Swiss-Prot record:
Name of the coding gene: ilvD
Cofactor: [2Fe-2S] cluster; Mg(2+)
UniProt GO cellular component terms: cytosol
Protein name: Dihydroxy-acid dehydratase
Keyword Protein biosynthesis carried by entry: no
Domain of life: Bacteria
Active-site residues from the entry: S476 (proton acceptor)
Pathway listed: Amino-acid biosynthesis; L-isoleucine biosynthesis; L-isoleucine from 2-oxobutanoate: step 3/4; Amino-acid biosynthesis; L-valine biosynthesis; L-valine from pyruvate: step 3/4
Record: residues binding [2Fe-2S] cluster: C119, C192
Origin species: Nautilia profundicola (strain ATCC BAA-1463 / DSM 18972 / AmH)
Length: 562
């Protein structure tokens, strides 16, 4: 066992002495040591109950002949950090989480890992950290929140509240309606109920095989979710106690190139958050998988979009996907397409393959999970656009487009999200404009803020089908409309988005994966020579360190290690 390095032999007497101080007995030094990476934090609705979940996991680990050691990571609630400089810290928190997993697991030579994340950057951060350690690892998340309902029964969620602010600004709803939205949208614990970033990532870790069947859709705070916790704990013990299984189920043996492909296939089929591209590129790098962004458009061409969930379809939430058969039903339906790129032979953590996991699955509600013969679209719900405005690519959630997929309009440029919010609310944006929000990339922000407030204002003001928005920042999973993010190179590194001027004509063609500004090569070269990027003042020391080390979005916004 890996943990023998800290517990076996006469020279480890001091180490054992410290372990005994925590309550370990002689017999415990013969057992595998299991790290329980929790992310309990009281301020996040998807995490305030995870302390109880960790107790369930640890109890099951002890019952199954192993020794659990719980430790915690930090967490940021993107919804609460939204719309102010707190959002600068959201994406950087992913790197702290990854570093903390790597640090605790390697410093103490733990044999295996069970991770309990749920929201936003916490799930991908834990996956990245687990890949660095490369021991057997199993993920069991806190689970999705139930959808909220208005007094008339209309289903709502957090995205409805954000858009409600825009409607209130425009005078379309009164203060009482906005208050009802605020009070009823989030009825209890769990990751926000739509296909936002948290639930997108939690379905993708199930698709990759490092979480058990049902992980992405079983609701939080239910007996079914508690049994999932116990099953995950039993399985990690079974693996850790067997030398052959320990080698077989190292996390890099599961998250390989096929698993990355499978994650993106499922992402396309369900129209997941555009943030998944950022996180999956980072995960691919940690897994030593060379994944080119151009591959996503190829995957999109071979993947039907068969499930729409809020914010793409506001009446459907994660509980509906679970009722309709869950992720296994989605994957089985995808596999029926003759040219699918879903790899059914890849391993899953419970043993066997993807094919074994989904063989008995069935779609129980074809209105929620459409049959492959009747998809929402024959191409996937995400696309990567390239052109002179984004030579290294940018991302759009095609599943959320509410208007035309081809757009030509005049640029209205803002050098920060706050500038954009002020411009939108003051009436500066009109039909046919392209809102450009720059210096919000990983380096320029720094921290790559989410642009949910500007996009929600645009939707709430009734301009969602008539205005495009492009940014080197990113979007909340709750964003919809013609919203294009992750523009690379970003403005802070001299990207074309930084050279744009008000009135420049921007052409977007989603179906041909292109985005360009209508300027001559001579004019572009002239602007490059005259260009000096803006460098923002930022609070604290961590963001300054982050800005020095972070790569752009096309590289997953990971930190340079060399």
């Amino acid at each position: 066992m890996r943990s023998d390095e800290v517990k076996k032999g006469w020279h480890r007497a001091p180490h054992r002495s410290l372990f005994r101080a925590t309550g370990l007995k002689d017999e415990d030094f013969e057992k595998p040591f299991i790290g329980v990476a929790n992310s309990f934090i009281e301020i996040i609705p998807g995490h305030f109950f995870l302390n109880k979940y960790a107790e369930i996991v640890k109890d099951e680990i002890r019952k199954n002949g192993c020794v659990p050691f719980e430790f915690n990571t930090i967490g940021v609630d993107d919804g609460i950090a939204m719309g102010h400089d707190g959002m600068l810290y959201s994406l950087p928190s992913r790197e702290i989480i990854a570093n903390s997993i790597e640090t605790v697991m390697n410093a103490h030579k733990l044999d295996a890992l069970i991770c309990i994340p749920n929201c936003d950057k916490i799930t991908p951060g834990m996956v990245m950290g687990a890949l660095r350690v490369n021991v057997p690892s199993i993920f069991v998340t806190g689970g999705p929140m139930r959808a909220g309902h208005m007094p008339d029964g209309t289903p709502i969620d957090l995205a409805t509240v954000f858009e409600g602010v825009g409607k209130f600004e425009k005078g379309e709803i009164d203060e009482e309606t906005l208050y009802n939205l605020e009070c009823l949208a989030c009825p209890g614990g769990g990751s926000c109920s739509g296909m936002f970033t948290a639930n997108s990532m939690n379905t993708l870790i199930e698709a990759m095989g490092i979480a058990l069947k049902g992980n992405g859709t079983v609701l939080a705070l239910t007996p079914e979710r508690e049994e999932l916790l116990r099953a995950a704990a039993r399985r990690i013990c079974e693996i850790a106690k067997d030398e052959q299984l320990t080698e077989q189920y190292r996390i890099k043996n599961i998250i390989n190139e096929k698993a990355i492909h499978n994650a993106f296939v499922v992402d396309m089929a369900m129209g997941g958050s555009s943030n998944t591209v950022l996180h999956m590129m980072a995960i691919a790098k940690e897994a030593d998988v060379d994944f080119d962004l151009h591959k996503l458009n190829e995957i999109a061409r071979h993947t039907s979009h068969i499930a729409k969930i809020s914010p793409s379809l506001q009446t459907v939430h994660m509980e509906d996907i679970h009722r309709a058969g869950g992720m296994s039903a989605v994957m089985k339906e995808i596999s029926r397409r003759s040219d699918t790129i879903l790899y059914l032979d890849n391993p899953v953590i419970e043993g066997g393959t993807v094919a074994d996991r989904i063989k008995d699955a069935e779609v129980k509600d074809p209105e929620v999970i459409h049959p492959i013969e009747n998809p929402y679209s024959k191409v996937g719900g995400l696309a990567i656009l390239f052109g002179n405005l984004a030579e290294e690519g940018c991302v759009i959630k095609t599943a959320g487009i509410t208007g035309e997929r081809k757009f030509r309009g005049k640029a209205v440029c803002f050098n920060s999200q706050q500038e954009a919010i002020e411009g939108i609310t003051s009436g500066k944006i009109k039909k046919g404009d392209v809102v450009v929000i720059r210096y919000e990339g990983p380096k320029g922000g720094p921290g790559m803020q989410e642009m949910l407030a500007p996009t929600s204002l645009i939707m709430g003001m009734g301009l969602g089908s008539d205005v495009a928005l492009i940014t080197d920042g990113r979007f909340s999973g709750a964003t919809r409309g013609l919203s294009i993010g992750h523009v690379s190179p970003e403005a802070a590194e001299g990207g074309m988005i930084g050279l744009l001027k008000d009135g420049d004509i921007i052409e977007i063609d989603v179906d041909n994966f292109s985005i360009n500004v209508d300027l001559t090569p001579e004019e572009i070269e002239k602007r490059k020579k005259e260009f000096t990027p803006i460098k923002k003042e930022v609070p604290g020391k961590w963001l300054k360190q982050y800005r020095m080390l972070v790569t752009n979005a096309s590289n997953g916004a990971v930190l340079r290690a060399e």
